[in-house]
Amino acid sequence: MEFRGSGATAVEQHLLQSETPGKNGLQATSSDQVGRTLRWFTTVVLNAAFLGMGVSAAVLGPTFPDLARNVNRNISSLSEIFVGRALGYLGGSVVGGVLFDCMNHFLLLGLSHLLTAAGLYLTPFCKTAALLTAMMSITGVSFGVLDTGGNVLILDLWGDKGAPHIQALHFSFALGAFLAPLLAKLAWGTTASAQNHTEPQLDRSALNRSFEAASDSVLAVPDDMNLLWAYASIGTYVLVLSVFLFAPFFKKRSKQKKSAASAQGARRAKYHRALLCLLFLFFFFYVGAEVTYGSYVFSFATTHVGMEESEAAGLNSIFWGTFAACRGLAIFFATLLQPGTMMVLCNIGSLASSFFLVLFDKSPLCLWIASSVYGASMAATFPSGISWIEQYTTLTGKSAAFILVGAALGLMATPALSGILQGHYPDLPVILYMCLGSAVLTTVLFPVMYKVATLPLDRKQEKSINSEGQKILLSSSRLIKEAK
C-alpha cells in the first residue's frame, strides 16, 4: 500500500465501508463538505486575526505621545516599551512553537487573543512606565504565539496549496498596520488631546473621587478619553475574534479530524536542521533590512539628501504603501508562481534597488523610485519563504518558532546597530550600506538553501519518513472511525 494523498483516501473509505456499507458515499460527501467549510472558516478567521494583530501593533506609533503623557514621561525616555514588546514576541514565539505541537491549535490561539484583549484594555489605564512596559510585553507574547501558530495552521490546512493563503495572511497584517494610523487620527483623534480639554476635564472631575491619588496610583482612568476608546475598540475586536477561534475547539469533531493536507505524510529534508538554520539567517537579514529602512528612511532623507519633512514623510509612505500593495498582489501571483521563483524575483529586486540607492544616494529622484521598488521587492519575501520551506521539510510549531526568532532578532539588532554606526559616521549613508549588505547576503543564502533542501535522502531516512507517514495515516483513519 502506498501512503500518499490518494492512499489516505482509500484507507479512510475502506474504514467507512466496513462501518456503514450502504451510506459511505453520502457520508464521505458530507464529511468533505464539512471539512472544506471548516477549512475556509478557519482561514478567514486567521486573516481577521492577523488584521487585528497589525492594527494592535501599529497603533502604538500614533498613540505613543499620548501614552508617554499618560505615564508622565518624555517620548525619548520611553523606548523600553518597544524592547519589552520585542522580548515578549521572542518569548511568545518560542512558547507558542512548543505548545502548538502538544495542545489544540484553536484553544491556544483563542487564549492568545484573550491575552491580547486584556493587554489592550489595560494599556490606556497604565500610569507607570514599568506597568506599561509589562502590558506591551504581554501583547508581544500573544503576537508571537499568533504569528507562529497562524503560519503553521495555514500550512496544516492547505498543505502544498498554502502559498496564496500564507500571502493573504501577511497581507492582512500589513493592511492592519496601514489602517492603524488612519483610524487613530481620523476615527479616534488620539493626537488632539492637547487641543480638546473640555470633555476630558469633565470626565476627570467626575472620576477624581475614585482616583484621588492618581499621581501615585498604578492604574487610573486616562486624561484623554480618545486614547481609552482607541485601545478599547481594538481590544473588543480581538475579544470577538477569540470567540470564533474557540468555536472549532468546542465543535464535536474539530479535535478528531485532521485536514487532508496534513494527512499526506511528513516531509523532512536530508539536512533538516541545517536548512532551518539557513532560513533563520535569511530572515534575520531580511527582516532587519526591512525594518531598518522603514524606520530610518525619513531621517536619512532629511539629513543626508536634504528633503523637506513633508517630502520625507511622503517617501516613508511610498515605501510602506508599495510594501502593503504588493503583499496584496502577491496573493494572486502565488497562484501562478512557485514560492522559490517569487523569492528569486524578490531577491533580485531588493538587490538592484538597494544597489542604486547606494550608487545615487544624493539623488531625490532615485530615492523615490528605488524606495518604491525596494518596498515592492521586500513585500512577498517572508511569506514566500514560509511556503518555500514547507515544500521540502514539514514545518512544525518548534521549527516555525525557531525561524521567527531569527526574524525577531534581526528586527531588534539591525536597526539598533545601524543607528549606532550612523551616529559614528554621519556623513556616510550607513542605512543604505546595511540594506545593500543584507540584500547581498540573502541573495547568496537562497541558492545555498535550495541546494541543501534538494539533496537526496538516504535509504534509512526514507524508511524513517515513510514509517512516520504511515503512523499519521493510521492515526487519522482511527480518528475518523471513532468520529463515525
Curated annotation (Swiss-Prot):
The modification Phosphoserine is found at S6. It is found in: Apical cell membrane. May function as a sodium-dependent glucose transporter. Potential channels for urea in the inner medulla of kidney. It comes from Rattus norvegicus. The keyword Transmembrane applies. This is Sodium-dependent glucose transporter 1. The lineage of its organism: Eukaryota, Metazoa, Chordata, Craniata, Vertebrata. Expressed in brain, liver, lung, and kidney. In kidney expressed in cortex and inner medulla, in ascending thin limbs (ATLs) and lower descending thin limbs (DTLs). Primarily expressed in the proximal tubules of the kidney. GO terms for molecular function: symporter activity. GO terms for biological process: D-glucose import across plasma membrane; sodium ion transport. Its main location: membrane. Belongs to the major facilitator superfamily. One of its GO terms (cellular component) is brush border membrane. Gene3D superfamilies: MFS general substrate transporter like domains (1.20.1250.20). The chain crosses the membrane at residues 40-60, 80-100, 106-126, 135-155, 168-188, 227-247, 274-294, 317-337, 340-360, 366-386, 401-421, 428-448. Induction: After water restriction, up-regulated in inner medulla ascending thin limbs (ATLs) and lower descending thin limbs. It is a multi-pass membrane protein. Keywords: Cell membrane, Ion transport, Membrane, Phosphoprotein, Sodium, Sodium transport, Sugar transport, Symport, Transmembrane, Transmembrane helix, Transport.
